[in-house]
Every structure is written in structure tokens, then in C-alpha cells.
Amino acid sequence: MDTIYYIVESIDGDYAYLKRTDADTDEFKLVARALLPDGIDAGTKLKYEAFEYEVI
């Protein structure tokens, strides 16, 4: 499994916009907040591995 690193750019209701920090891209990934750890906010750094997000 690949490990991908993100930062939460913004939160819009029940969704969060994530930006990869380990790759050079300007695209955002829209993810339902129900799939993310509790207590996230803009600026939170996340690790995605084995289909789970973890705050780092």
C-alpha cells in the first residue's frame, strides 16, 4: 500500500478539501468528514494509509 500525505486546506460543511503534500499538484481531493478523524480543521496534516486517514 502507498502512503499519501495531505493537509486540510478548507472545510465546507460535511466535506473537507485535502491537498497532497508529497506530490507536486494543484488539485484538491474532496473527502466526506465522516471518513476523517475527529477534530480536524484547516491546516491539519493527515496520513492516508491502508484506506484510513490519521492525524500526524
What are the language-model segments listed below?
Residues 1-13:
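Structural detector for short beta-strands of small beta-barrel domains
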Residues 3-5, 28-30, 45:
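Well-ordered beta-strand positions in beta-sheet-rich domains
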Residues 26-38:
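Beta-strand/loop nucleic-acid-binding surfaces
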Residues 35-48:
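Short nucleic-acid-contacting surface segments enriched for D/E, G, S/T with interspersed K/R
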Residues 50-56:
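Short, Lys/Arg- and Gly-enriched loop/turn segments at beta-strand edges
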